[in-house]
Structures are given as C-alpha cells and as structure tokens.
C-alpha cells in the first residue's frame, strides 16, 4: 500500500474512533459548542483529505455529514435521529476504509441511500 494511503487509513480510523465518542457526548450535550466544533473539524479534515487523495465515495459521505453538522453549528437542534444518521455514516466510512486498506483502492458502489437520508435531514433541520 502506498505510504500516503496507509497514513490516511490509520489517521482516519483514529479520527473515526474519536468521532464515535464525541457524537455520543454531543447527543447528551447538544448545546456544547466545543464538542460540535471538534466533530465538525474532524469530519471536515476527513472530507478534505479524501478529496486530495481522489477518493470520491468517501469524500461524498463526509461532505454530506459535514453539511448536516454545519446546520447544527448554525443553531439547528440536533435530534437523536440526526445523530444516529451521522453514526451510520461513520460506520459506512469505516467499512469503505476496511476495503480500501485490503484492496488498496476505494471499493465500487454508491451511497445514495445514506447521502439522500443526510440531505433530507439537512432540509428538515434547516426549515
């Protein structure tokens, strides 16, 4: 595996572990701006690195999650359903990363189901 890709997989897995914990904390304390900023920063970093490395599937998932997190930063209330949806996105990203590590390329497939759910949630919390 390319060193840059190996480092990306390692760092992203570490970030995802932190995200899991932070999302649970955020669900318990949705008005905590520090937790929200940390979550947003981690997702934004993952998205940006995916774009740099040419991983469009991962980038699209991270972008959709980042957009929803941005709504929370703008003051929209975070529901349990929204946090669960972001956790499902994190799980999907982990699955894709496992395949990326094994196959040394992003797996084929689409994530329109999850991205559409995230987009619908953005519309719901944004209105």
Segments (PLM) and residue ranges:
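Non-catalytic helical tethers at domain boundaries
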Residues: 1-127
């Amino acid at each position: 595996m390319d060193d840059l890709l190996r480092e990306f997989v390692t760092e992203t897995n570490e970030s995802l572990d932190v995200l899991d914990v932070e999302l649970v904390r955020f669900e318990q304390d949705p008005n905590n701006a520090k937790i929200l900023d940390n979550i947003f920063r981690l997702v934004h970093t993952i998205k940006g690195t995916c774009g740099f490395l040419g991983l469009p599937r991962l980038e699209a998932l991270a972008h959709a999650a980042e957009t929803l997190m941005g709504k929370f930063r703008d003051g929209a209330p975070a529901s349990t359903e929204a946090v669960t949806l972001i956790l499902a996105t994190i799980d999907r990203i982990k699955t894709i990363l496992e395949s990326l590590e094994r196959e040394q390329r992003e797996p084929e497939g689409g994530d329109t189901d999850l991205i559409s759910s995230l987009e619908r949630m953005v519309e719901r919390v944004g209105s």
